[in-house]
């Protein structure tokens, strides 16, 4: 018996039979017509009307009745009428075949067809609108115009009575116990049965040879678990309609990594080889660094790490912890060579296409929800002596850590909206100070004006560049950058000691402290202060006298004496009692010139009194009437002391600059005996108050000597009523960034705006320490399980060609988000409790895209061109904008935001920085024309959206993910995802016949724009995907296309370039056999 080849297959094959030297693309449409007339129509069950059809499908358990009962029959009929009004025709045989073979509902024996394309679209629209007729109308229009296509699980299952889940993919954490492993396998099978793809994180599993209950060399490692999963996924599928799909991930720092990779070797032994299970490798930046330096590297046994640190290997920041793990003798480790492993990865990917690669730090660096990702030990941190401005004034980070109190901190208003003009401060809540890393590498940032800070390279700063505010990590700063410093009066403490503060200021300026005595000197025009100082000292002694025995001649009411009665040029006071009181409050011989710690937590009157005493003795008003220049200055040989004063003044709203004279010199100074003589002096430094606003504010707060007040007023009266705006604009210019040792570091989290003021400098803060995916702990039957957070996501994709043709980006995104949201709400996977919990709390969706190469080719734009990047930059920005907008609107409508939204960079506004500072409109005129009359969101639109999101929140934790779009691309007659095509005319084998699929709209005119991926420069492909990635909050399915002439070194170069450009993940690496190549271009 011979199998007859159907007529539609013959017609499709005639595409490749040249006529006049050209392919016969028109034959594909003839094949579609034959397929319908000769097969589809002949095998479709006939119903007299829609009611008869629906009654039959419900009665025989093909359709759910519940979702249909939410509409009237007239509404349902109207949706079907809309669908059929389009008179839809599949443009290619492959698209029609894919739909009817993979998606159309069939009788139980699979012999008869129960749905046409219009029927499936109508049911999906009704199901995803969930009783909202107007939404159902929008969705049926959008799907019939093929602007939006739900992913396979939704398109296949929506509305069916016997169905799988509509969620596309899951990620499970696997705990390190037999109960955890068994439960993970069971849940994987349940999810596979429902039609979902499942990825599992194996990094918590003990490596081969680790101990169990202190018995060494007892564990089998990850490969045994992989074999179990491989068999599980092959066994559990969706009733034969959709095969099970699983993937497992392991870090390059796990000791089983080599065995893990060997499971995909073509030559691997059957005992270790996995057949259907996909594998992926997690690559942190530290590994890339070690490979570039051609160094050996260490892998760490997870259980020994857990025993030592109480956290799993994949929960640690390996970039920061690597050296500590290497040096820690209690952490078991194995040695390897980073470059050799990179080479092994390249060889295996060339042979099998595996493993997938995830660049862990590229994912985390731009993760808007990093506050609920794994713990970051090296996030945004400062050293212990750094002063944080709180509602109680300045307090040391280390001291706050010891107290562990909830904080109220002062922030600069410019960090709220990134507006240069929004000067001012606000007091907001923050969590208790945290010790975020021990022995962290420290860098010192110095500014031209004297402000300094010591922090880790990840600490974030607010920088004014090109008139705009940006938030940058320390390792992104450069000399010349202008850091924001506090722009208005802040907050003060509650300590009230103005007399004590005043005398401390006097002594810091013109006093000395010996081993037992405090001395105060008054000379020249300072002698007028005699009575004021004497009265203050007496009040201090009366209030704070130390309970101790003094000599009989010790005065409790010390007075000034004349050092040289004849000259009457020096007054001095000695007091042992005052010495004891000053010592009690932290002032002694060594600390005399530093601002006492309690002053930083004192009230404004007390701080002003200290500054008054200091400036009355060591300060002056420098007035130049000719130049109309007026400055208030304070000179000292102690630079750090002036920095203390600078912080106090900045908190009062007074901007200062510190100047240094680094040359040693001689000065005429009092000799302590009533006379003067030349002394060698150390280099001097001067704090200067120059701008008019700061000068006048200072004089209203701090009491200067009468003569200085006279000079100040005399010149001020000659100035214009209004002065120009200060040039400093409350910024400080960086002059150096230097390594500065290793120390413990601290930080807190201010969840509203993620900003703080350290040492007067406006900075970012740490994100909250939680995990986005939390491992579950499954116990024995008599104990309660601990359910964590696994990850689920339902997908759908927009067809770029049709969306752009219909000028409908905004409306399609809105409709797609609504549809995906309904799927999320209607999903409850009880067999996977951690997935169900995450779906309820996180509400993640994944709006993707397809037909990018098709769109570019049909508009005569080369995939590798600058114009392609220009289009992608604008298009994907718009999708991001409208998806954020719709998620915000749903949050506003429902009053609900996703779990822990308040800790996200969406809430802080940080996420929007690049959008409110950069214009993403098209740069090329040709690309501009493609967008037609569609509104392209501008900076003002983004600023409004930022404001709305910060106010109302977001409903979804994740919104975009660009999947490969395999089968649904064929249904849409689309190129897959955002990747370039592999072949201009695909050849497929079904049964005993071949079929051909020309790329959508392929013609002689666009033939060369449909360049095949294997002929492209992969570096330029990386550039285009990197352009897209910056607008996509999740990942992109990115396949590398290689020729077999490429070396492993070539592949490594591409991988490293992808990492450098911020690519998050690399999917398959496909290799083409160049010996089979033929030339097709001559027969177009």
Curated annotation (Swiss-Prot):
Tetramer of two alpha and two beta subunits. It catalyses: a 2'-deoxyribonucleoside 5'-diphosphate + [thioredoxin]-disulfide + H2O = a ribonucleoside 5'-diphosphate + [thioredoxin]-dithiol. This is Ribonucleoside-diphosphate reductase NrdEB subunit alpha. One of its GO terms (cellular component) is ribonucleoside-diphosphate reductase complex. SMART domains: HintC, HintN. Its EC number is 1.17.4.1. The gene is nrdEB. NCBIfam families: intein_Cterm, intein_Nterm. The record marks 1067-1068 as: Important for electron transfer. Disulfide bonds join 169-793. The keyword Ribosomal protein does not apply. Residues 503-654 form the DOD-type homing endonuclease domain. The record marks 1079, 1082 as: Interacts with thioredoxin/glutaredoxin. Coiled coil: none annotated. SUPFAM superfamilies: Hedgehog/intein (Hint) domain, Homing endonucleases, PFL-like glycyl radical enzymes, R1 subunit of ribonucleotide reductase, N-terminal domain. The lineage of its organism: Bacteria, Bacillati, Bacillota, Bacilli, Bacillales. The keyword Nucleotide-binding applies. One of its GO terms (molecular function) is ATP binding. Provides the precursors necessary for DNA synthesis. Catalyzes the biosynthesis of deoxyribonucleotides from the corresponding ribonucleotides. Belongs to the ribonucleoside diphosphate reductase large chain family. CDD domains: Hint. It comes from Bacillus subtilis (strain 168). This protein undergoes protein self-splicing that involves post-translational excision of the intervening region (intein) followed by peptide ligation.
